[in-house]
Amino acid sequence: MTKRVLISVSDKAGIVEFAQELKKLGWEIISTGGTKVALDNAGVETIAIDDVTGFPEMMDGRVKTLHPNIHGGLLARRDLDSHLEAANENQIELIDLVVVNLYPFKETILKPDVTYADAVENIDIGGPSMLRSAAKNHASVTVVVDPADYTVVLDELSANGETTYETRQRLAAKVFRHTAAYDALIAEYFTAQVGESKPEKLTLTYDLKQAMRYGENPQQDADFYQKALPTDYSIASAKQLNGKELSFNNIRDADAAIRIIRDFKDRPTVVALKHMNPCGIGQADDIETAWDYAYESDPVSIFGGIAVLNREVDAATAEKMHGVFLEIIIAPSYTDEALAILINKKKNLRILALPFNAQEASEVEAEYTGVVGGLLVQNQDVVKESPADWQVVTKRQPTETEATALEFAWKAIKYVKSNGIIVTNDHMTLGVGPGQTNRVASVRLAIDQAKDRLDGAVLASDAFFPFADNVEEIAKAGIKAIIQPGGSVRDQESIEAADKYGLTMVFTGVRHFRH
């Protein structure tokens, strides 16, 4: 019996050659629309889909393959006489191979000028239906959705006259992943169009970007996936210019660092980060000086860390950076001279370019946190805050210099692991106290790190002080200005302690836990 293949593809790469080889093997080819035109023009004999269905394509191609003569030919089980008898009685010829890829919905909605009508028109109906029918009946039917699989299918058909069950099963699994992702993307688009923020069913689709050597530790397997609709301002979208592949920990740290630098848009800024915590943030009128400040914040912890800059890296800055062991440098761009300095002296240094013109768009993305058996979803902590909304709760008002430093510190503390404390001046971090299980321990840690640089320093806390002992420690160190959310039932005790020691304390009313 002559074998039949149905070919209907939007991605025509390699399809002519594939069809020509099938013809050499004696296959009949059914085809549709533009695919049939392409094959006919290449001299490949095909059967029109309406010759199989006995029904013309209609409604601008919306209805062409949704017909029993197609789906009966795909779904009939070859091991059931009743199925074969039904096919014979209804003059349905069996289809043994389906080669289909889908309307380019993703590519359509990524166009800047796409209309809603364009998006709707590029939702494929017949294609997924054929793919799913063929995949369901993979015991008998081979289904191909990816041109990368043409070669293996041809090799097996040439060698054995048919594909192996293992190949058909693998290709069926790929199809169900593909159609599920396709539908998930459509669902995501429509959910956004109707403004539904808390759907009862959450469907997400991501594409494999990088198979990783291992995860957080060598004994853990890991892979890196990118959103099917990419976010421009993202570590997943950064362009790597030099160095080894990013590791699992590199990616997590880089993501944390570029989130931090989003909040420092106005002036040249450098963020140094290690193990998801900032170890140095420097801000100045030029990027070279900003690097100096970030490095001086903690010259020890920056070793083996990440540096993110929000301005182009010039040669002078590159000369200073190359003398420090860094895992990654991320910047919007690099001068040719700067790139040459970094690459020539650091062959394995991971150098990434990430334009900063899409920062705002990145802030609207939801955050997903996996738990065993579930997924937590929240919006990002990107609330717009203004010092005009803050409240000075002590008798003493901050000086102009203290006010500037407090604003800088408040931006920085948001990214320190809780319980988080940070000590800064108006242009650089001086001490970081992250992740302690009691707040006073974080206070002591940050102050100890700042040591002899406390003159004129201020302190920020990511959450309220539960007891006045925190203020006592701060006053003892000589720090005169504090910024914190407030909100404790014992706030008054902290205020009275601050007044007692002549401190100024600002309440922001916004907590910034980070776990």
Curated annotation (Swiss-Prot):
Residues 1-145 form the MGS-like domain. Keywords: Hydrolase, Multifunctional enzyme, Purine biosynthesis, Transferase. Pathway: Purine metabolism; IMP biosynthesis via de novo pathway; 5-formamido-1-(5-phospho-D-ribosyl)imidazole-4-carboxamide from 5-amino-1-(5-phospho-D-ribosyl)imidazole-4-carboxamide (10-formyl THF route): step 1/1; Purine metabolism; IMP biosynthesis via de novo pathway; IMP from 5-formamido-1-(5-phospho-D-ribosyl)imidazole-4-carboxamide: step 1/1. Transmembrane segments: none annotated. It comes from the Bacteria. The keyword Plastid does not apply. One of its GO terms (cellular component) is cytosol. The IMP cyclohydrolase activity resides in the N-terminal region. NCBIfam families: PRK00881.1 (NF002049), purH (TIGR00355). Belongs to the PurH family. This is Bifunctional purine biosynthesis protein PurH. The lineage of its organism: Bacteria, Bacillati, Bacillota, Bacilli, Lactobacillales. The gene is purH.
